[in-house]
Amino acid sequence: MNLISKKNELKQGFYPLFFLEEFYTRVLIHMNHNHILKIGNIKESKLIHVNRICHYLLIKRLIRQIRKQSHKYNGISEFPNYETEFYFQYKNRFYNLIIENAFLLILQMIWQHQKTRKNDPSILIHRSIQSAFPFLEKKIIHCIWIIHGKIQLFHTIEQFNFLFLLLYERIRDKSFLHLLKNILNLNKEFLIEKFYCEKFHLIELSMFFRNLYINEFDSFIVYHIVKTWKLAYLLNPIKAIDDFSFIQKNDILLNIKRKQKRLPLVCWLANKSFYSLYGNIHYVRRDLSFLMAIQAGKHISRFWKYNCIKFLQLKLGFPCSLDVLYLKSLFNQDFLFLGYRIVNKLWKKNFKIRAVSWYSPILFFLKGRRISTKMPVFNLIDRLSVMHLCNLEGYPIHKAAWSVFNDKQIMNIFSNLLRNILFYYSGCSNRSDLGKIQYILEFSCMKTLAFKHKSSIRSTWTQYKKHVSFLSLVKNRHKNGKTSVDLYFLFQKTNKFWLLDLSKIQDSLACFILMD
C-alpha cells in the first residue's frame, strides 16, 4: 500500500502527512548521513545507536508537538533514561534535521507531480555558457533597452514573503505553509548564499528553494514574452532548468517543427507579424546574473507598461519608473556580464518623447553598443583581492587558508586557477595584460609556500622555481590541452574572438564572472 496517493495529495493537502509515523520512517531512511552532527571523536557505531533511539522516542514527541502547534525545535527537554551530554546535544539537531528532510521530501513529491503539468508556459533550454556571447554580439547592437541585474535571494522580508506566495500558488495548503514559514523564520540564514571561491555547503532544503525561486523567475519572464507574442500554445513544457537558461525567438520556432506541418507559413507570421507588433525580447541568465535585450516594435510601450515594470517591481524588489534622467544615467554606464564588459555609447540626440494618454514612452536610439574585447584587468585584480590573493593595488599576499594543504596541492590550485583564466580570456585583444594576473598568482603561491614552511621567499623560490613558474603555461601551449593553439593565427581581426567551448565553469573561475 502506497504511503501517499495523488488523489489524497489534491483532496486532503499535505499538512496531515506530519501526523503519520510511517512518513518519518521514510524520511529517516532518505536522510543524508553528511547532515548528522558529529561531536568530538564519537565512534560511528554510537552515532547509529543514538539515531535509532531518536527514531523511536522523538518521532512520537515531534508528532504530538505538531498537533498542539507548539513546535519548538531547540527547546527540547531531556529524557531521563538517556541523559548524556552527547545525546542532549544530538537530539536538538535531530529535530531540525527531521523537520527539514520531512519538508524536503514532501516538496519534492509536489514538484514531481507538477512536472507533469501540460500548461506550463516556459521555455528553458540548456546551453553552454559560451553560446551567449555570439548571440549577444549579433543581437545587442540592434536592441534599444538592456536590463541587467541579479536575482536576490531572500535578503529582505518582502522577498522572503514572496516565496510563500509562489508556494501558495502551487500548493494551496495554508496549514502546511504556516508550519513551513515558522521553521524557516528560525533558520533564515541557511537561505542566503554568498558567492566566493570557497563556497560553504548549504542544506538541501535551502538549495531546493533557491532553484525554485530561479525557476519561477525564468517562468515569469518567458510567460510574458510568449504571451506578448501570442505563441504560448506552441511551447514545449518538458524542458527543465539546469544551470543556464537561454531564450530567443529561434528556440521558440524550433518547437513549431514538432507540432505544426505548415512550418514556412508559421515562421513567416512569427517573423513578420509578431516582430512588427512587439519586437524581439532576448533573455540570457547565468546562475543569478541575467540580461534582457529588447528590440522595439510598434507596441513595445505596451509591453513595457504591463509586463516589464511589473516584472522589475515584483522580482527585483525596487520601484521602476520611466524617468528620463534615471534611464539616461542608467544606460550611459558600462557594465560587466559573464566576465566581459558591455559598452554603451549614446548619440547626442538620444531621446525621442511622444505624448500618449497613459504615459510618455521614451524611445532610445543607442549607437555603438557592443561587447568589449578587452579583458577587465582591474576587475580581475579586485576579485583576486576578495579571494585574499592580493591587495586592492595588486600586490601579492599569501593565502593562509590554503597552507594546510601539501605542497603539490597548493601548486595545483594556483596552476589550475591561472589556466582557467588564460583559457577564458584567451581571445581578448589585450591578452598581454594576463601577465599581471600571472605575476600575482605566481608570487602569491610562493608566499603561501613560504608561509607554510616558515622560510624566506628567496629560499622558497630557489626550491620550487621549476614547479611554481607558471610561465610555461603561456610559452608551451602545446603541453596544456586546448591552450595549445596559435593565438595569433586564431584571433585575427577577421575572426570572431568567441572561440571557447566551456560547457561548465569551474568553481575557481566562477568567482570572477559571478561577482560583477
Curated annotation (Swiss-Prot):
Q: What GO biological process term is on the record, naming one?
A: mRNA processing
Question: What organism does the record attribute this protein to?
Answer: Chara vulgaris (Common stonewort)
* Keyword Calcium set for record: no
Q: Which family does it belong to?
A: Belongs to the intron maturase 2 family. MatK subfamily.
Domain of life where this protein originates:
Eukaryota
| Places the protein is found | Plastid, Chloroplast
- Gene Ontology cellular component? chloroplast
Q: Which UniProt keywords apply?
A: Chloroplast, mRNA processing, Plastid, RNA-binding, tRNA processing
Protein's name according to its UniProt entry: Maturase K
Q: Which PANTHER family match?
A: MATURASE K (PTHR34811:SF1)
Question: What is the documented function of this protein?
Answer: Usually encoded in the trnK tRNA gene intron. Probably assists in splicing its own and other chloroplast group II introns.
Which molecular-function annotations from GO does this UniProt entry contain?
Answer: RNA binding
Chief subcellular location? plastid
Residues forming coiled coils: none
